[in-house]
Swiss-Prot record:
GO biological process entries: proton motive force-driven mitochondrial ATP synthesis
Binding partners and assembly: F-type ATPases have 2 components, CF(1) - the catalytic core - and CF(0) - the membrane proton channel. CF(1) has five subunits: alpha(3), beta(3), gamma(1), delta(1), epsilon(1). CF(0) has four main subunits: a(1), b(1), b'(1) and c(9-12).
Subcellular location: Plastid, Chloroplast thylakoid membrane
Protein's name in the database: ATP synthase subunit beta, chloroplastic
Residues where ATP binds: 172-179
Membrane topology, record value: Peripheral membrane protein
Catalyzed chemical reaction(s): ATP + H2O + 4 H(+)(in) = ADP + phosphate + 5 H(+)(out)
Coiled-coil portions: none
Source organism (scientific name): Acrocomia aculeata
GO molecular function list: ATP binding; ATP hydrolysis activity; proton-transporting ATP synthase activity, rotational mechanism
Enzyme class, UniProt record, top EC level: translocase
Gene of this entry: atpB
Keyword Plastid belongs to the record: yes
Family, per entry: Belongs to the ATPase alpha/beta chains family.
EC number: 7.1.2.2
Amino acid sequence: MRTNPTTSSPVVSTLEEKNLGRIAQIIGPVLDVVFPPGKMPNIYNALVVKGRDTVGQQINVTCEVQQLLGNNRVRAVAMSATDGLMRGMEVIDTGAPLSVPVGGATLGRIFNVLGEPVDNLGPVDTRTTSPIHRSAPAFIQLDTKLSIFETGIKVVDLLAPYRRGGKIGLFGGAGVGKTVLIMELINNIAKAHGGVSVFGGVGERTREGNDLYMEMKESGVINEKNIAESKVALVYGQMNEPPGARMRVGLTALTMAEYFRDVNEQDVLLFIDNIFRFVQAGSEVSALLGRMPSAVGYQPTLSTEMGSLQERITSTKEGSITSIQAVYVPADDLTDPAPATTFAHLDATTVLSRVLAAKGIYPAVDPLDSTSTMLQPRIVGEEHYETAQRVKQTSQRYKELQDIIAILGLDELSEEDRLTVARARKIERFLSQPFFVAEVFTGSPGKYVGLAETIRGFQLILSGELDGLPEQAFYLVGNIDEATAKAMNLEVESKLKK
């Protein structure tokens, strides 16, 4: 049974209804709390510790019940630092799970795991809240139709298309354009689909979170002058926060996204960076709760925890949540339980290549390593499928020939191979694209390219109709007509120089 959003405050409202307990034990971020007989809180209930420490500083710590131990004792995990807490302090059972603000008022704001704004812009203008623990939509509510989620980014739409309501793994190291790609997707979904985005920073570096916020303001994704016109809500649980906060911040972001899908009936883009740190935080909490570790030291409940998050990310008859998740692979070991469990849920993978980024090809999406379960003739159609396969075959052949070219040069290749290389280099450059969010850096206007235009462009390159055009004409353009126009301009410029 799904819990509907309510207009009640997450804070305990009436003093007489308080269910009070006392702290019996503190082990780092884990508290044992004793309640009166018959007054035990439920699993996942939020507990609040209020008071003052030994030097008179105000304490306000929210915890979540994880285990019922018997003898009227529960074990809870704190969502913030437990500094200053002492045995015997009073604990209030709120009688409900953690609830966070939802709705349009969350756009343009930054929240912590508890749904509290942390951007110094004052309180959130909404009384509608929703619990972070909810069941996944029932089968009868799901939209089982397989449909492509058009992003307007050529390389993604052609070679590794996203599924509407699907989950995409984003693999990329530092400095290859991951943040810019994320911001462009946020911008494009707002323009083309009228949708909104939610960004969940799970175990992020504080600096990275701050940089993302500043870049979003600079590019207009967050509108400083009119915050209500912003296209994204941000939820951060940084590296320095307790494992409880890092474990639950993904659910906070997902709950905000669910409201836009279920109530506003919108298409939502949910970013989780990094899904590995969600697993890592769960592993820390599991050890603190005294559970026996499983393979490679991970929690025994790894699959259950991952499933409870991922199954809520789906398409319903009202709208969809399409999730893009950054995936860190420990020691590049794809068999590690954390990434292996994540892969089982993914519909597509977008791999960013440092080699392409070094060449200046942006977005630096690797056309051969990126995959999608949606790239099938019965889903995307024969024309799209055939074009994508031919683009991949040409790129693969070019990759195989690169060693020969490096040693012997282009002249030693056969006529057919030289033609393949020329077309592959045009394809490589045509897969680049000017982004709207990068306009402030490049000075070039951004381009949204529809799927039909993308397919037409690559078909013309593969057919040989554009063999006479210089390869630089295909670099950082939108559709194929722009490449043709750019080639004419280059020709005029070269004549003028002569």
